[in-house]
């Protein structure tokens, strides 16, 4: 029987299990300070054409989302997102538990627009009582979205420009990014994400790994002391090499990004259809 209710119906890509077994008795430093994590981070930087990017490995997507958002925002700030966005409806208030409100915008097929972002910020700033409200400080989007649609390069470019003009960070949830990258309807590359976003992540848990996400930070302002935030928010794995090894295995699956992750062909067909 084929199961489509979630991305967790199977274990991991065979290459992941093979590498974990092969290196099982290797002795390395903990907490992601090992050579496997370093090598995987280098591979990701190369794929993104972002040699100065900071790459951090997390145990899961919820930890990645709440850590990035809490580390980036000031205590009085919130994050603009679609009202269908994962952080707003499917993470048990994890972001809001850190003290940052999810400022939800009406979605259209899972997406929000640069125009909506500008309107929300301009409306906030025009309010005479704006200092009594939560200040927008970041935009969060998922790509693919929670309903399987894809942002185009033009849409992401417009959102990035709006964020830059308004002084907002742009954060892309890439828990299912591999699905989007392999879609025939996609026109975005990892290099585009690195150029247009302040921070994004490559999902592993939903895309062939047993667990793990790779957060890529391109904005220098967000890089300093970020590991403190990871540890404080429960995102740092003691046996961190397990994360680096899994991404190494996935990244070694092929020479181009289309071959990075193993996913069900039936789901890919659906993603290609729903754009």
Where are these regions (language model features)?
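Conserved PLP-enzyme active-site core in the AAT-like
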Residues: 2-275
């Amino acid at each position: 029987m084929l199961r489509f209710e979630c991305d967790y119906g199977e274990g991991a890509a065979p290459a992941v299990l093979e590498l974990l077994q092969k290196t099982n008795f290797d002795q390395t430093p903990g907490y992601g300070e090992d050579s496997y994590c370093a090598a995987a981070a280098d591979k990701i930087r190369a794929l993104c054409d972002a040699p100065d990017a900071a790459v951090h490995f997390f145990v899961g997507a919820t930890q990645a989302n709440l850590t990035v958002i809490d580390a980036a925002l000031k205590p009085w700030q919130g994050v603009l997102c679609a009202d269908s966005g994962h952080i707003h409806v499917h993470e048990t208030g994890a972001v809001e538990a850190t003290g940052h409100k999810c400022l939800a915008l009406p979605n259209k097929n899972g997406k929000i627009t640069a125009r909506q972002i500008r309107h929300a910020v301009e409306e906030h700033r025009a309010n005479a009582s704006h200092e009594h409200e939560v200040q927008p400080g970041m935009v969060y989007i998922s790509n693919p979205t929670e309903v399987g649609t894809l942002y185009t390069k033009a849409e992401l470019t417009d959102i990035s420009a709006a964020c830059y003009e308004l002084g907002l960070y742009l954060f892309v949830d890439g828990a299912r990014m591999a699905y989007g990258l392999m879609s025939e309807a996609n026109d975005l590359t990892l290099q585009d994400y690195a150029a247009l976003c302040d921070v994004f992540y490559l999902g592993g848990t939903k895309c062939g790994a047993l667990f793990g996400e790779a957060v890529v930070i391109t904005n220098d302002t967000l890089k300093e002391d970020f590991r403190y935030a990871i540890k404080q928010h429960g995102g740092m794995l003691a046996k961190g090499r397990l994360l680096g090894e899994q991404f190494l295995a996935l990244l070694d699956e092929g020479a181009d990004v289309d071959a990075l992750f193993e996913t069900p062909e039936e789901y890919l067909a659906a993603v290609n259809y729903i754009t």
